[in-house]
Amino acid sequence: MPIEAVAVASLPMASRSAALCFSSAAAARSRSRSRHGRMAVSCDAGASDLLYSSLAAKLLGPPTSFDAGKLTVEFAHSHGNSSSGFPRAYTLTHCDFTANLTLAVSDTIAADRRLRADDVFAEWKQQQQQEGMALHVHCFVSGANLLHGLAAGFRYYVFSKELPLVLKAVVHGDALLFAEQPELLEAKVWVHFHSSSNAKYNRLECWGPLREAANAETTHKRHALEQLHNAITKGTRRRRRKWSSPDAIFSALLALLL
């Protein structure tokens, strides 16, 4: 008689994120719906789609809503609390336990901060000729941590899903800059996804004007995310018979607990 399901692990109070730690909020919602707070891993190949869909639903849930009350802004000494212009860079960090956001505004991105793969970095750059300024955002999908490579697809999706929240934090936290230079809201947003372990996720995307990119309901990005979700769902059917292997189960757990 085949084993239908095996409870393998209790989820932690606050899991590390697949990217930016935003998946921890989804994990909390999933735990609140589970009576025992455990994840069932099916050993039956016929039930693999259900398992993978549950895993995807946890990480690919709705975007996190921006709450200005949870945002703390820290200005470097050279900027003070005013819009002192450029160069200008941002580092956004997230706390698992409180869901608080911290936006650090500085001249440049410190090299040691780039090693924190769950943070998001952004900087203003002058474009060629008369195109004005553009905001370049950097997300580290995989490479710094071997375990991140096993969950690269999920990390890429979570970064994409939560990027409007990041941009809203920048616009709100650096409000004086945008008050003095409102044209920056029309600046293009270029998103650099960095992945040294998976070339598929090592890519550059143009998200359009900042005003639109910060809107989670933007039609273009919503359509793109739906396409990515469908691609992952199709991948589920192709991998149906692989879920009984220890490697597949291990990868799923890493995606949940990173």
From Swiss-Prot:
Question: Coiled-coil stretches, from where to where?
Answer: none
Task: Give TM segment ranges.
Answer: none
Which InterPro entries does the record cross-reference, listed alphabetically?
A: Staygreen
Q: What induces it?
A: Down-regulated by dark-induced senescence. Circadian-regulation with a strong expression during the transition from dark to light.
Q: What does the entry state regarding organ or tissue expression?
A: Strongly expressed in leaves, stems and panicles, and at lower levels in roots and seeds.
Q: Which Pfam families match?
A: Staygreen
Report the protein's function. Promotes chlorophyll degradation in leaves. May be involved in LHCI proteins degradation, regulating the balance between LHCI and LHCII.
Q: Which family does it belong to?
A: Belongs to the staygreen family.
UniProt protein name: Protein STAY-GREEN LIKE, chloroplastic
Higher taxonomy? Eukaryota, Viridiplantae, Streptophyta, Embryophyta, Tracheophyta
